[in-house]
């Protein structure tokens, strides 16, 4: 945040010219507790400089005649950053934004400090949004697309503030100087935003996800007494998103207060929400909009749970490979019951898990 216009200079540390103005390298402290360190020429910023704002954010770059010009870096108080092009102190031109881990989360253009033109928003899970933003810089319009983590399959259509209202199945064929080119799948299905509630898992429970349908299928598990399992439809590299875990959204308190038998398909989404696939939706013939709940537990898993922002389901979990998997290989995850919380006979976990744990520990001791 640049509050320079609203502040009054309090102190100057450094060289002054004959008129008492900063000249050379100086530190200027403002009454707002903002601070600027950089080069001055007779009271105007000229050369490299950096603002330190009261909220912990910073802005650095090259100044000409008291205004930021060219490439500048704004670092947010949480450590994320915006690398942009400045013209007379305003963001105008190409820009990239990065999260606190240094991952690219935005690429596009700015005009007069507002996102402009065709922009890309990147999610940590590998998915992305692309389209021409509106006059407020929001991803709103009828030519916006969500692109799945494979960078190929997409849902193209109408979005409001980055949320899909209606998307048609499409293929991203090319990207030319940041501008994507899509081909709609002939007679392809249309998808709508369908975030679950505590009582409704989906308005179209038998409408499968196109990305997931290319990568996994359900069959009898190879694990003894495990029922159905989730299998790879195609060979996939490590770190590939394979499947999605949607469910009704209930509280941790509700889960903790009921019997283990009712928690066979629950997974924690965050500190407040648990995703649950209850009966009858645990049957593939009643619910196949997402299949992540079909993955069975293993103490030597080839996959892991991860968070995912889905264009249809909203914030959910996904199943991501931890190593390369072969076609028709069963996908397994570690269910992650807490071994430090013990009951009378072992960890606070269902009986089948305790039995598998005992057997696994026995093999490790051989």
From Swiss-Prot:
SUPFAM superfamilies named in the record: Histone H3 K4-specific methyltransferase SET7/9 N-terminal domain, SET domain
Signal peptide location: none
Pfam families the UniProt entry points to: MORN, SET, SET7_N
Binding-site residues, S-adenosyl-L-methionine: 226-228, 296-297
UniProt-listed Enzyme Commission number(s): 2.1.1.364
Reactions accelerated catalytically: L-lysyl(4)-[histone H3] + S-adenosyl-L-methionine = N(6)-methyl-L-lysyl(4)-[histone H3] + S-adenosyl-L-homocysteine + H(+); L-lysyl-[protein] + S-adenosyl-L-methionine = N(6)-methyl-L-lysyl-[protein] + S-adenosyl-L-homocysteine + H(+)
A GO BP entry: peptidyl-lysine dimethylation
GO CC annotations, alphabetized: chromosome; nucleus
Domain SET: 214-336
The keyword Methyltransferase is annotated on this UniProt entry: yes
GO molecular function: histone H3K4 monomethyltransferase activity; histone methyltransferase activity; protein-lysine N-methyltransferase activity
Localisation per UniProt entry: Nucleus; Chromosome
Record's keyword terms, sorted: Activator, Chromatin regulator, Chromosome, Methyltransferase, Nucleus, Repeat, S-adenosyl-L-methionine, Transcription, Transcription regulation, Transferase
Site-annotated residues for Histone H3K4 binding: 245, 256, 266, 317, 335
Domain notes: The SET domain is necessary but not sufficient for histone methyltransferase activity.
Protein name: Histone-lysine N-methyltransferase SETD7
Originating organism: Xenopus tropicalis (Western clawed frog)
């Amino acid at each position: 945040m640049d509050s320079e216009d609203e502040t009054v200079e309090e102190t100057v540390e450094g060289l002054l010219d004959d008129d008492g103005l900063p000249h050379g390298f100086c530190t200027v402290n403002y009454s707002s507790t903002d601070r600027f360190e950089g080069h001055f020429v007779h009271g105007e910023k000229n050369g490299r400089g950096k603002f330190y704002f009261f909220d912990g954010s910073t802005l650095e770059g090259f100044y000409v005649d008291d205004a930021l010009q060219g490439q500048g870096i704004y670092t947010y108080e949480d450590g994320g950053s915006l690398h942009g092009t400045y013209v007379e102190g305003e963001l105008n031109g190409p820009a990239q934004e990065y999260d606190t881990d240094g991952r690219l989360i935005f690429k596009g253009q700015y005009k007069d400090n507002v996102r402009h033109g065709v922009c890309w928003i990147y999610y940590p899970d590998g998915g992305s949004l692309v389209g021409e933003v509106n006059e407020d810089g929001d991803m709103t319009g009828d030519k916006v697309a969500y692109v799945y983590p494979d960078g190929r399959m997409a849902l193209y259509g109408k979005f409001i503030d980055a949320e899909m209202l209606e998307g048609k199945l499409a293929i991203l064929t090319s990207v030319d100087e940041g501008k994507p080119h899509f081909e709609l799948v002939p007679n392809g299905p249309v998808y709508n935003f369908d975030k679950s509630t505590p009582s409704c898992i989906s308005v179209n429970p038998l409408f499968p996800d196109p990305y997931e349908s290319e990568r996994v299928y359900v069959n009898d598990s190879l694990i003894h007494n495990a029922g159905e399992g989730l299998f790879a439809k195609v060979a996939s590299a490590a770190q590939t998103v394979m499947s999605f875990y949607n469910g009704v959204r209930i509280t941790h308190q509700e889960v903790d207060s009921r019997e283990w038998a009712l928690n066979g398909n629950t997974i924690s989404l965050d500190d407040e929400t648990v995703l649950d696939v209850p009966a009858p939706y645990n049957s593939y013939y009643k619910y196949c909009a997402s299949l992540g709940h079909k993955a069975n537990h293993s103490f030597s898993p080839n996959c892991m749970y991860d968070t995912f922002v889905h264009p249809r389901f909203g914030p959910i979990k996904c199943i991501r490979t931890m190593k390369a998997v072969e076609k028709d290989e069963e996908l397994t995850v570690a269910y992650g019951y807490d071994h430090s919380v013990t009951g009378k006979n072992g960890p606070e976990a269902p009986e089948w898990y305790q039995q598998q744990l005992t057997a696994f520990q026995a093999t490790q001791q051989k």
